[in-house]
């Protein structure tokens, strides 16, 4: 898969591009890049017990809240989210931000994001069906904190 053929998955203002899927790494890791525009407040606080998530800031600044503690992650900064930690992120800053996410083992893939995108798109600009998003999350190993 090359940069010119990478699928961009859009969930409202959020854009996700997988660089490496779990199937390509023998299940050891999945890696995706994501963009969050200024002022965006996403996603639902959640946890996952089956994998760790490491965030590497590429541009701009995102504020990640992990187990109630907010941390700004900017270019070149790293945040490790352990299994079971409740977390979420937002971009309350004036500039767009992007980051790289590394998931180990690589069990979270693009299907999760496609399904969430479908639920958000079905809302046609209105608020998405929170119960439907929760169902998608649980099906892919995420536990909503709501």
Label the predicted regions.
Residues 8-9, 68-86:
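Short acidic-glycine-tyrosine-enriched beta hairpin
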Residues 9-45, 51-52:
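A short glycine-rich, His/Asp/Glu-containing loop-to-beta-strand
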Residues 63, 83-110:
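Ligand-binding loop in jelly-roll beta-barrel domains
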């Amino acid at each position: 898969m090359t940069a010119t053929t990478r699928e961009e998955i859009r969930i409202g203002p959020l854009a996700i591009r997988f660089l490496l899927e779990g199937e390509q790494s023998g299940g050891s890791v999945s890696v995706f890049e994501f963009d969050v525009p200024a002022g965006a407040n996403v996603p639902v606080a959640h946890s996952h017990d089956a994998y760790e998530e490491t965030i590497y800031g590429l541009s701009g600044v995102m504020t990640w809240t992990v187990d109630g503690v907010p941390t700004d992650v900017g270019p070149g900064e790293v945040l490790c989210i352990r299994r079971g930690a409740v977390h979420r992120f937002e971009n309350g800053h004036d500039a767009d931000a992007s980051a790289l996410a590394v998931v180990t083992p690589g069990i979270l893939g693009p299907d999760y994001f496609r399904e969430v995108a479908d639920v958000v798109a079905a809302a046609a600009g209105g608020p998405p069906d929170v119960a439907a998003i929760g169902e998608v999350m649980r099906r892919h190993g995420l536990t909503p904190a709501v």
